A protein has these predicted regions:
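Positively charged n-region of N-terminal signal peptides that target proteins for export
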Residues: 1-7
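Sec/Tat signal peptide C-region and signal peptidase I cleavage site
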Residues: 15-19
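Extracellular/periplasmic metallocenter environments
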Residues: 20-26, 42, 46, 61, ...
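N-terminal edge beta-strand
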Residues: 30-60
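Beta-strand signatures of extracellular beta-sandwich domains
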Residues: 73-77
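Short edge-strand/loop segments of extracellular domains
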Residues: 78-84
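Extracellular/luminal beta-rich ligand-recognition
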Residues: 85-108
Length: 145
């Protein structure tokens, strides 16, 4: 279970200061404006590539695949946002929404009616079960690594 907590918290963000912090990171991008594509493979103990460099103004299509056996999240955020999101993810685990290898989508939908944070529907992140793939398009408003 400890491994699950470590891996699920690898890339996290917060919705509390979402709007203000997102201005520093960027915004949802448009497919018609994509300037490059980056494939991200999420394993249980690491992600590939290890680092990603982007420049201000770039619109990047991330093709993200969970190649591990645990649920993983990929998101674009500041370190401060990652730290604030940890308790939200823990709440999702405590409420039975996030299981080690599965997302209980019915419970997520039900719980999101009481707490919108439980919906986990953010344009800067994808939450994937093992073997799932997703795409995220993001326009960066500053240089980032």
């Amino acid at each position: 279970m400890r491994l699950f907590f470590i891996t699920i918290f690898t890339l996290l963000f917060s919705t509390q200061s979402f709007a203000a912090a997102m201005k520093m990171v960027g915004m949802k991008g448009k497919a018609s404006e994509v300037t490059k594509t980056i494939r991200v493979n999420m394993y249980d103990n690491y992600y590939e590539p290890k680092t990603i460099n982007v420049k201000k103004g770039e619109t990047v299509r991330f093709i993200v695949e969970n190649k591990g056996v645990l649920v993983h999240e990929f998101n674009i955020a500041t370190m401060k946002m990652h730290k604030k999101h940890g308790p939200e993810m823990l709440d999702m685990m405590k409420n039975g929404i996030l299981l080690p290898n599965k997302i209980n989508k019915e419970k997520m939908k039900m719980m999101s009616k009481m707490n919108h944070k439980m919906a986990h529907s953010h344009s800067n992140s994808v939450l994937l079960e093992p073997k799932q793939k997703a795409e995220l398009i993001w326009k960066f408003t500053s240089n980032a690594e």
